[in-house]
Each structure stands twice: as C-alpha cells, then as structure tokens.
C-alpha cells in the first residue's frame, strides 16, 4: 500500500524568515572617454615655456637656418604643408612660429608611450591608408576656429630622404576651407638625431590659395592643388631631395624660391 505523505506546512513547523530585498547599488559613473579628435588645449603659459625650451635645445644640438619666415601669415587660419624626413621635423617646422599649432598625427602614436607627448603638442589622430573622414572633419573644425594646422602630406617619414607622392587629404582640406597653404621645405633634419650640430634649413614659401574650377570640388581639383603645393616644396629643396617631384619641377620650369633670411 502506498502511503501519502502530507507536505503541507503545519503550524509550528520551522520556516525560513523572508530575506530582505537587497538594495540595488547605483551604477558607478563611467569615466568619459577622451575625444582624441579634439586637440588638448595646452595652457598658453605652458605652451610658450615649452617653445622656449625647444628653441634652446635646438640651438644646442643643431645649426638652424630659417628662410622666408616673412611669408607666414601673422593671423588667421592656414595650413603648413611640409616634406617629412625625420622625427625631428615635428618640433623643427613650427618652432619659430609665434602662434600655437595643431597637428595631424598617425593613430599609432596615441596607443604608444608617446601618447601624452603627442597630445601635449596639440595633435589629433588620423588613420593612414584609408579615407579618415573624422580626421578630415576635425582638421576643418580646427581651421574654422582660426588655428594653424601642420600637415605632412606624404603621410610618413621618407626612408630615402627624398620626396614621396603625397596623399590628397591636404588638397581636399585646402579646397573645402579656402584657407591659405604655406609650403615648407626642410632638409638636413635627417641628420639631427645622428650627428652633432648638423646644418638644418627650413624654408617657408609664399601662401597659396585654391578654389575649385567649377561649382563643386572635383578629384581633379584636389589632385591639382596637392601637386601644386608639392611642386612648390620640391622647388625650394636641393635637387637631391626632390624625389618623385624632381621631374615635375624641371618640366614646369619652376625655379627654386629664394626667400630672404628672417631673424629668429
């Protein structure tokens, strides 16, 4: 015979007291992520102090000659477009400018130990090898604010110490914003980290302003603007540095510019 077991709780049976509901902990506030496309706003006092220190160090380690500084606008937004031979180009190219500058720097720098230095210099990232629309918008925004944008259109340092074919981003930004482009030629900087007190020359060319041929900016407009700036840079360089633009300088008959020396 099967015996039925009554499982109903009877009075007096031991019961577990109800557990109080656990209080829900408020979510911890998350630290807002840094917007790397907004350059760090270095305080003016700190920036000019760093600039003074950089000038002092540069005076000790190299013999710097600066040409055509009078070609650089004293106000308003503009682009500095330079050839790129060495890491040293980054502090050398704008070191004699009185105003603060911002840079486009490759994305890898922002994930390295150099990230804090890059941010302090006022740089924002760009993804190389692809059309980084966010970086282009950030560049245009900086120019709309009246800032100076330093660009190295070749995209990286030249391993052969000669000019390589430029990317089109600089030409596109110049056409979209309408700001002047100051071509800059630098040479000798490839020796700055290898020799003691080598001669380094920085030559600032005349500002160039570009407009589209028609109502809309075309690929041809962008390519022509980019090539015109690069030919101007090549024309200021000694022949052995001109690289892929050597033939174009000779073909167009462009004579090397000879800006007068400017005081430091």
Identify the role of each PLM range.
Residues 59-67, 184-187:
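Short gly/ser/thr-rich secondary-structure transition/capping motifs
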Residues 69, 83, 106, 129, ...:
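Generic beta-structure capping elements
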Residues 64, 101, 149:
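Hydrophobic anchor at the start of a short beta-strand
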Residues 46, 51-52, 59-60, 72-131, ...:
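Catalytic core of membrane glycerolipid acyltransferases/transacylases, capturing the structured
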Residues 70-73, 250-251:
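A short beta-turn/loop motif at secondary-structure boundaries
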Residues 63, 77, 199-201:
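A residue-level signal for beta-strand positions that form part of recognition/binding surfaces
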Residues 2-46, 134-264:
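Non-catalytic C-terminal accessory region of glycerolipid acyltransferases
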Residues 66, 103, 123-125, 181, ...:
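Conserved beta-strand scaffold positions in the cores of enzyme catalytic domains, especially
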């Amino acid at each position: 015979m099967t015996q039925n077991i009554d499982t109903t709780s009877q009075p007096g049976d031991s019961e577990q007291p109800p557990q109080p509901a656990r209080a829900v902990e408020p979510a911890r506030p998350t630290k807002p992520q840094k917007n790397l496309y907004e350059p760090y706003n270095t305080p003016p006092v700190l920036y000019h102090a760093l600039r003074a220190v950089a000038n002092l160090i540069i005076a000790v380690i190299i013999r710097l000659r600066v040409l055509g500084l009078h070609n650089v606008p004293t106000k308003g937004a503009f682009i500095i477009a330079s050839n790129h031979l060495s890491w040293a180009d980054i502090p050398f190219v704008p070191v004699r400018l009185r105003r603060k500058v911002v840079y486009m720097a490759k994305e890898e720098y922002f994930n390295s130990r150099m990230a804090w230095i890059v941010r302090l210099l006022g740089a924002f990232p760009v993804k190389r090898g692809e059309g980084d629309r966010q970086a282009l918008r950030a560049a245009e925004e900086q120019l709309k604010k009246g800032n100076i944008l330093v660009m190295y259109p070749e995209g990286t340092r030249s391993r052969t110490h000669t000019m390589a074919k430029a990317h089109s981003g600089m030409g596109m930004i110049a056409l979209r914003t309408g700001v002047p482009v100051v071509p800059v030629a630098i040479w000798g900087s490839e020796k700055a980290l290898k020799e003691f007190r080598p001669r380094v020359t920085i030559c600032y060319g005349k500002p160039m302003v570009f407009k589209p041929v028609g109502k809309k900016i075309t690929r041809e407009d962008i390519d022509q603007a980019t090539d015109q700036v690069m030919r101007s840079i090549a024309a200021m360089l000694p022949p052995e540095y001109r690289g892929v633009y050597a033939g174009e300088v000779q073909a167009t008959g462009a004579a090397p510019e000879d800006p007068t020396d400017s005081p430091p």
